[in-house]
Curated annotation (Swiss-Prot):
Pathway: Mycotoxin biosynthesis; patulin biosynthesis. It comes from Aspergillus clavatus (strain ATCC 1007 / CBS 513.65 / DSM 816 / NCTC 3887 / NRRL 1 / QM 1276 / 107). It comes from the Eukaryota. This is Carboxylesterase patB. Its EC number is 3.1.1.1. Substrate binds at residue 258. The active site is at residues 258, 380. Carboxylesterase; part of the gene cluster that mediates the biosynthesis of patulin, an acetate-derived tetraketide mycotoxin produced by several fungal species that shows antimicrobial properties against several bacteria. The function of patB in patulin synthesis has still to be characterized. The pathway begins with the synthesis of 6-methylsalicylic acid by the polyketide synthase (PKS) patK via condensation of acetate and malonate units. Pfam families: COesterase (PF00135).
Length: 555
């Protein structure tokens, strides 16, 4: 069986390396695989540079493709594996809340808050992670040996291996290309005599480095949505170079969860012109961003706070500071944000994002030929809506936070019509916290899958993941399942089914195959539910007036 050596599969670099690992000539450099995984039968090409270091004058600016020619052979060692990381402290409180809920034990919000913010001194940056660097615009390519041995395909020639590109989650402030181990997916792709698929993981700038925005920032020479521009350059790199690894540039699928899934939607609507994107298919899992949390004043305040924390008065001065100063300032800014608030992320900029991506999809400003597989979880918002929402006043404050960028009539409509204070079972909630959870799920994640399907003309497929606790991101361990030894808490039956569906979609554009339950072609009404109690077709919970309303709101 493919999963009998689960412990080795857990390490993508577990190596019984041949004496001469393969080398690929990218034009600007020659890059050698760092290892060969003898269990999974694939090569790992890690830390391939796809952009010049975003340092100095290139900070807060669009990425620049590599230029020149290096005479040396590189293998990716000694480089920054991840971009500077940060996490809002309130997420640590939420993790304690969801753990208590899962265990069925009481939760003391005030005690948890005190522990995180005071005892743990969460807002102060910890010692720098040696794998973290501003010079982080790299990608990893994992190539099955059978694919590599067939030789590189001629540029743009069809017939190469399918390619799965993964954009990580992390609320636009954390995460890296190395967070997930693709060994299980690669093994699944090699079943039934197939040569398998190529897997690519991408780093993109996070936090202040990738997502500052607003009038002051832009007028100072900053470029909003630099993180999206990084992703775009990496996807274009794949179109130009993946044939050198044996991949087919016309068979690229981009997959992402949460921030990664939200980014995919913005890549679909890039520039608002319906242009052909640098991929053929997408898999979006809980595609998330918070469209209503930004206002011009909030954007300017974030920028001012960032400069003040650096003790500078201009972006040019910030660009000249040492990296550790910027990294620490980024951490403090993100860590100290108000409870429940998304901090940094995509913003309407009149360029890459000319309008709300929700409305751009409604207006048909995405390429309709892209094939789509979507999913969301059954309890998306439970672990994200603040744990201290227990009464009408706290719910109203949350509405104000989530919809700060809208006018008062939208906030009133949300609180009285879409999510009224009715707890008799006639609404999909019975508590104030569940009411807030549904607001977040609809506004930030679940409904986005519906909008994406409606914007394309190709047959699409939709899944709901309801394996308990079915929280936001709880399907990720199933996607990257590596067998019962490596992942003993994962429902292996559901995980292997989900992996087969993903791999089939990557290969053929259709997730179905014998003997698995069929995922119906999405019609706006039904989808396939994956749960501990079975797999069945059921009504899509996004088929409601709430989702219809949020797509049309001006954020």
């Amino acid at each position: 069986m493919l999963f009998t050596a689960s412990l080795l599969l857990l390490l993508p670099w577990a190596s019984a390396a041949p004496a001469n690992l393969p080398i690929v000539d990218l034009g600007y450099q020659r890059h050698q695989a760092i290892s060969f995984n003898s269990t999974g039968q694939y090569y790992s090409f890690t830390n391939i540079r796809y952009a010049e270091p975003p340092l100095g004058s290139r900070r807060f600016a669009p990425p620049v493709a590599p230029h020149g020619r290096s005479k040396n052979i590189v293998n990716g060692t000694g480089l920054g594996y991840k971009c500077p990381q940060a996490l809002a402290c309130w997420f640590n409180v939420q993790n304690k809340f969801t753990s208590a809920a899962a265990a069925g034990t009481p939760f003391d919000f005030n005690a948890a808050y005190e522990e995180v913010y005071t005892k743990d001194a969460c807002t102060e940056p910890a010692k720098q992670d040696p794998l973290q660097s501003e010079d982080c615009l790299f990608l990893d390519v994992y190539v099955p040996q059978d694919v590599w041995q067939k030789g590189p395909q001629a540029a743009h020639q069809k017939g190469g291996a399918p390619v799965l590109v993964y954009l990580q989650d992390g609320a636009y402030v954390g995460g890296s290309k190395s967070d997930q181990n693709p060994a299980g997916l690669i093994a699944r792709s090699r079943e039934e005599g197939s040569s398998g698929m190529i897997y690519v993981g991408i780093n993109y700038r996070l936090g202040v480095f990738g997502w500052l925005s607003g009038r002051k920032f832009t007028s100072s020479g900053g470029k909003p949505n630099a993180g999206l521009l990084d992703q775009r350059l990496a996807l274009e790199w794949i179109q130009r170079h993946i044939h050198l690894f044996g991949g087919d540039p016309s068979r690229v699928t981009v997959m992402g969860v949460s921030a990664g899934g939200g980014s995919i939607i913005m890549q679909m609507t890039a520039y608002g012109r319906g242009i052909s994107p640098p991929f053929a298919q997408v898999i979006t899992q809980s595609p998330a961003w918070e469209p209503g949390t930004k206002t011009p004043a909030i954007e300017d305040d974030l920028f001012d706070t960032f400069l003040a924390s650096l003790n500078v008065t201009s972006l040019d001065q910030a660009r000249r500071l040492p990296s550790h100063a910027l990294t620490d300032a980024n951490y403090r800014l993100v860590a100290s944000r108000p409870y429940g608030a998304g901090v940094l992320g995509p913003a309407i900029d009149g360029d890459f994002i000319p309008d709300s991506p929700k409305r751009l999809l409604l207006q048909g400003k995405a390429n309709p030929g892209v094939r789509v597989l979507t999913s969301y979880t059954a309890a998306e918002g439970f672990g994200i809506a603040p744990a201290n929402i227990t009464d009408e006043a706290s719910f109203q404050r949350y509405v104000g936070l989530m919809l700060a960028g809208t006018d008062a009539s939208v906030r009133t409509h949300a609180a009285t019509v879409l999510y009224p204070a009715v707890f008799d079972g006639s609404m999909p909630y019975r508590t104030q916290h569940d009411r807030a959870s549904l607001l977040w799920a609809d506004l930030a994640a679940s409904c986005n899958t519906r909008y994406l399907h409606a914007a394309v003309r190709t047959p699409g497929y939709a899944i709901e993941y309801s394996v308990p606790p079915a929280l936001h991101l709880s399907d990720t361990p199933s996607v990257f399942y590596n067998g019962p030894v490596a992942d003993p808490t994962v429902n292996g039956t559901i995980a292997e089914l989900l992996q087969r569906q993903i791999v089939r979609f990557v290969k053929t554009g259709n997730p179905n195959g014998e003997p698995d339950p069929e995922v119906p072609v999405y019609d706006g009404r039904d989808l396939l539910d994956l749960g501990d109690d079975g797999v069945l077709v059921r009504p899509d919970s996004t088929d409601n007036a709430r989702c219809e309303y949020w797509q049309k709101v001006h954020f």
